[in-house]
Amino acid sequence: MSSEHKRSLPAVTLAAIGVVYGDIGTSPLYTLRECLSGQFGFGVEPHSVFGFLSLIFWLLVLVVSLKYLTYVMRADNAGEGGILTLMSLAGRNTSDRMTSVLVIMGLIGGSFFYGEVVITPAISVMSAMEGLEIAAPAMDSYIVPLSIVVLTLLFIIQKHGTGSVGKLFAPVMLIWFLTLGVLGVRGIIANPEVLQALNPMYAVRFFIEYKAVSFFALGAVVLAITGVEALYADMGHFGKFPIRLAWFTVVLPSLVLNYFGQGALLLKNPEAIKNPFFLLAPDWALIPLMVLATLATVIASQAVISGVFSLTRQAVRLGYLPPMRIVHTSDMESGQIYIPAINWMLYIAVVIVIVSFEHSSNLAAAYGIAVTGTMVITSILFCTVAVKNWLWNRYLAWVLLVGLLIIDVPMFLANVVKILSGGWLPLALGMVMFIIMTTWKSERFRLLRRLHEHGNSLDAMIASLEKSPPTRVPGTAVYFSRATRVIPFALLHNLKHNKILHERVVLLTMRTEDAPYVLNARRVTVEQLSPTFWRVIANYGWRETPDVEEVFQRCWQEGLTCQMMETSFFMSNESLIIGERPWYLRLRGKLFMMLSRNALRAADQFEIPPNRLIELGIQVEI
């Protein structure tokens, strides 16, 4: 067992390097340049270079190494991480009011991720392409078109899956990080005094010397840790130890060496501020480095796209987004999915961003507000989990929370002031997603409440039907029921209009549990309610896909035999109308109706054969 673990650990660690660290690993392309480019009033002078390097180093240590890898990754749901997972964990042992607050915070954090995911591919690929400004200045007008071409190809291949090319991600990213380290060492050797910036006093002196202006500089320094949420979100794919091992052995040393190498170059040649990353390389290596940087940024973009697919699936399964088509691109790996609607909406948004902002420096102002906002929420949710779930001492938890927020809040506020210069973009995108998620959840709850208002008792109705049965026809009928104790509307309408009932009636409820996976032993519960009525409850985790055929197989094991092609499936199809509401709630109702019209039908969700499906229309006022 241990030898197998030892053999697999290097492979899993290498895979983590290829997926988890793509975003944070491409930050050296633009971070130091943005810190010292002049927009904050800092010249390329020794004290500012030393100050920024010290800030970057200690952010990597305190935020990534300490906060996320040491503390936040302790909070897992059956091994899974991510902001929505943290939200669900935080709400388990709290009051209803507190749970509502935590849910809103979690949804805001998830919405911030949607805002960030539009910027990451754009700024990463454009930064790589901007190597042309150094390698071939005459071609700088092609940076935007080439960036769009590269990302177009990336979004096109999503539907085919990335399983085959994904095997190349880890080796390419390992080469990338080793290259970062080698380039950094090359710069440090030329000017080793730059290593003095490891001393945190340079960061302290930076704040003392520049006073209020240094606060705004945090808006640029945070670029060094964008992508930090991926460490936690991808925990379920690779495990805690491989992610930590990859960080401390490869990623952190490479990043620190490269940042300090760029700093050494700037101390020696302030003119290199134009693009210190590419100017760190010898002339003969510029084109190969640009190709490698492009590959690394494409991989970083792929990791972000995969992340938004996973987050969307989780939100759909937890009821915060409408059902949509989810394609599994791998028979072996459940995490490899493709969501066409999200893919193409994201592509259109990324292209618009590239065309509108034209240069990665313009996009840098938009980057950061979503990241730091999520960091603040993560700190609060984590400390809530520590107190409520793990029973930590409240005072120690408060001390930890204050310590985390002392770092998170100033960085968030420093990015808030950039709203007019681009920070509005992720905020606007995040707000749209927040409105969609809260609208779908609340209006869906309102709809279900209206559907269940008839108040008829299921047990009483079954007893009545058994005592005075209507005309019974041969076969099995399955009625989908959202609640276990409520009569399905399709059953009521079938009796009302057709006045018949099948010989066997199965009331099927599909549940999504607050866990990524459900044990097979708990998958299906079968309960016989009467000689001809059965209740079947199928439980799935949010990372799993409901499968009616699998449910039938497990029903057979429990003594209830159902054949897919010999069963009639009854569903209700709601036609929505908006009742009397204030104007703002009418707008929300119209948004819900639009989302409902475009949502994936339940029959398609469960892959029910069309010739076995009977839909009964009902009109519902919401």
From Swiss-Prot:
- Tell me the keywords, alphabetical order: Cell inner membrane, Cell membrane, Ion transport, Membrane, Potassium, Potassium transport, Symport, Transmembrane, Transmembrane helix, Transport
Q: What does this protein do?
A: Responsible for the low-affinity transport of potassium into the cell. Likely operates as a K(+):H(+) symporter.
Q: Which organism is it from?
A: Pectobacterium atrosepticum (strain SCRI 1043 / ATCC BAA-672) (Erwinia carotovora subsp. atroseptica)
Q: Does the keyword Magnesium apply?
A: no
Q: Output this protein's name.
A: Low affinity potassium transport system protein Kup
How does it sit in the bilayer? Multi-pass membrane protein
Reactions catalysed? K(+)(in) + H(+)(in) = K(+)(out) + H(+)(out)
Task: Cite a GO CC annotation.
Answer: plasma membrane
Family listed: Belongs to the HAK/KUP transporter (TC 2.A.72) family.
Main localization of the protein described in the UniProt heading? membrane
Q: Where in the cell is it found?
A: Cell inner membrane
Q: Per its record, what are the GO molecular function terms?
A: potassium ion transmembrane transporter activity; symporter activity
Transmembrane annotation, as ranges: 9-29, 49-69, 101-121, 137-157, 165-185, 212-232, 247-267, 276-296, 337-357, 363-383, 397-417, 419-439
InterPro entries according to UniProt? K+_transporter, K_trans_C, K_trans_N, Kup
